[in-house]
Amino acid sequence: QKLSTLLEVEDLVVDIPVPSGILHPVREISFHVDYGETLCIVGESGCGKSLTSLAIMGLLPNAASRNAKQLNLEGESLLEIPESALADLRGDKLSMIFQDPMTSLNPSYSIGNQLGEVLMRHRGATRAAARDRAVYLLEKVGISSAASRLGQYPHQLSGGLRQRVMIAMALMCEPRLLIADEPTTALDVTIQAQILLLIRSVQKEFNIGVILITHDLGVVARVADRVAVMYSGQIVETGTAIEVFEKPLHPYTQGLIDCIPIPGKTKPGEQLGSIPGIVPTLVGDLSGCTFRDRCDFAQNECADDVGENVLGAGRQFRCILPAELGSRKELVAVQ
């Protein structure tokens, strides 16, 4: 583990018993996050992105089980510490911005109470000190007249303001790792851009490692340092944002990128790209590449277990075919 590594995840597995068997929503995924770095985990709904974040936070549903070879924050295993110690970490070194700002804040408590509680709980701060910190951070996240907002309740704020409050709350104790689970989903496009810029600026200022979970490749292009592409509970490709966008190595990543309209290039009314087929079930025994039934490059060998190909530091993809997409097309042509 490098000195610059903040979070190290190796072979993380999440299993959930369901009436038809065992659901495997997260299957042996590995990644790391460095200090001051943004890792975007991208994939469609149901691929296991949010459960990955909940597994790191220790907030999985009671029925779910979590296992991993390594799950370390600043060298300390999150698998071996008791729940009370994990509760001390959450909101302190480890913070999360949840998906829907409309329902993430408690409607019964004022903004000031909810912000202050974090610092008082983890730092033993006085109410006055917590109030000062809350005002400072509300101003930092772009909320005007911050002191007057402390007495307001969530229903008195717009969605964009509520999400800014959630970001301020996550920053109250100067966390080392911030997990943002689709933080712009419920917001309009203009506010989305503001929130992304805000997360980026506070990350650089406080040297926070960020895991940004999203299904929006536009968000990824805007803020990611590195990208992990998830499909059916597995990470199928990792690399820097530039590497993944300019030279995708997994057919699923290529399919996602082909779905994006390009201003000035995509003609009005032109049919957009799509990925045929449906996502397979993750219940029961799974083998081979789960994307094979939807893949243009599928081979008989895809039904066998597919390992990770490592091209260099931080550049991997899970496919039996060569990295050069042109070579794949030649293979398909001769079939």
Residue spans for each PLM region:
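ABC-type ATPase nucleotide-binding domains, specifically the catalytic core motifs of the NBD
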Residues: 16-20, 58-63, 80-81, 86, ...
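ABC ATPase NBD coupling module
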Residues: 23, 60, 78-95, 113, ...
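P-loop NTP-binding/switch modules centered on Walker-like glycine-rich loops
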Residues: 58, 179, 183, 187-270
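Conserved ABC transporter NBD signature motif
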Residues: 65-77
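Conserved ABC ATPase "signature" region
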Residues: 76-77, 129-148, 257-258
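A short, proline-enriched helix->beta-strand linker immediately N-terminal to the Walker B motif
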Residues: 172-176
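Charged, flexible cofactor/metal-binding loops and thiol motifs
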Residues: 240-335
